[in-house]
Amino acid sequence: MTKLINNHLRNGYSDYNLLFLKRYVDELNLDYKILDVGCGHYRNLYLFYQLGFKNLYGIDRLTPDPSEKPKRFKVNFIKKDITLGLPYEDKEFEIVLCNFVLMFIPRKSLYKLLDDILRVTERFCIIETQKQFYEAKKGQILHYEFKDIVKYIESKEEFEIIDKKIYKEKLMVRRI
């Protein structure tokens, strides 16, 4: 774990995922199923793989290119637009990651997707977004307010927020 933490920037790992792992390592089981919503090229799932997790799932509208990962690194991947719903059972995943995805979701689909993310979460959910620092005519980051996402999740009685960093737009959630 120390080696991963020391090399997280070079490997592109989320420091917030590392903080989560460091805080809750004693509560985690290597048999947990982990879903990465908007998984990209599996960067975050590979972090969990390096720690010994094997039940890794990813969903994204784009096909990932894990060519630099070892052959034994396997992800159960579904290519799908996540705004159309997550094709998983309720509480199917002990850990759900959603890193730097929500800011690309149209507002009309955002809360439906949040409901779906929470629906498939059995224990923990980690959410990170990125502030839009300036308006661009053809920018991909859509206008949203992170504090609205936080308030929405706070309104869900079956979840508690275990860490939040409003300014950095980071959130850890646990199902109660």
Model-assigned labels for residue ranges:
Residues 1-32, 37-85, 109-112, 124-176:
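Class I (Rossmann-like) S-adenosyl-L-methionine-dependent methyltransferase catalytic domain
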Residues 94:
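Acidic donor-binding loop of glycosyltransferase active sites
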